[in-house]
């Protein structure tokens, strides 16, 4: 059996369009997950050539499998790409994550624990103040205690 034919427990599907800095932060966060049996599928709705080149470099450095699906930019066709990603997935359990959401370290684990046949699991996001969002960086996401540092300012 080819490695790409092998099943994985979870496919995480991320819609994407030119937001490479956010995607890099998401990849850093996925590298810190407590649950490791997952793949990431980037459903790209026509990103620029320079962005795709940077994405390919980023994909090569990940400790988890990443598939990049791309279609020509012919207007907003995000849902078409999401459907293609579902078909391409190697798991029976799918998680959809927007391209500007940084998952906490137990994101995949908690989704798997909540999984029930015939049900959909929906999570919440935390709307960050603009100043906090604009100050996000790969270095901050990679730093120890990132989640703790992020949550406390929001609570007080």
What positions do the PLM features span?
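Short aromatic/hydrophobic "clamp" motif used to bind/position activated sugar donors
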Residues: 94
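Glycine-rich, basic loop-to-helix element that forms the pyrophosphate-binding segment
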Residues: 72-89, 106
């Amino acid at each position: 059996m080819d490695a790409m034919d092998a099943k994985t427990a979870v496919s995480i599907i991320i819609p994407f369009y030119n937001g490479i800095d956010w995607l890099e932060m998401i990849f850093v966060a996925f590298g810190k997950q407590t649950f490791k049996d997952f793949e990431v599928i980037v459903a790209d709705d026509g990103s620029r050539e320079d962005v795709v080149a940077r994405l390919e470099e980023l994909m090569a450095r990940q400790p988890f499998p990443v598939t990049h699906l791309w279609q020509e930019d012919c207007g907003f066709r995000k849902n078409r790409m999401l459907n293609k990603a579902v078909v391409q997935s190697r798991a029976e359990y799918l998680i959809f994550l927007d391209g500007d959401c940084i998952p906490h370290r137990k994101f995949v684990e908690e989704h798997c624990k909540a999984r029930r046949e015939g049900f959909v699991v929906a999570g919440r996001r935390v709307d960050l103040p603009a100043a906090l969002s604009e100050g996000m960086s790969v270095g901050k996401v990679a730093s120890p205690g990132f989640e703790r540092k992020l949550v406390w300012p929001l609570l007080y």
